[in-house]
């Protein structure tokens, strides 16, 4: 049941850009994971800001879970899943 308060809601920030095949794969992975884990997916186009382009331009896609980097480049579904599982276990303890 999805009933966490907003304070406990996990936020995945997904840094991406148009025309990025790795980003498309990563987004599919995140949407698949969202079926099993309750999180908000915040998608940010790095081209919306020179600062973001400079920071993440060579790394994208970049995935952060609650502000902590969980992966970049080729996003590993199992790594992200494990981090989400750890967070879920921590919230339920």
Model-identified regions with their sequence ranges:
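A generic structural signal for alpha->beta connector loops
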Residues: 9-11, 36-40
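Structural micro-motif
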Residues: 54-63
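Thiol-based oxidoreductase modules, predominantly thioredoxin-like and allied folds used
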Residues: 39-50
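Proteins that catalyze or organize thiol-disulfide redox chemistry
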Residues: 1-10, 89-93
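Conserved hydrophobic residues forming the short capping helix/wall of the S-adenosyl-L-methionine
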Residues: 30, 34, 84
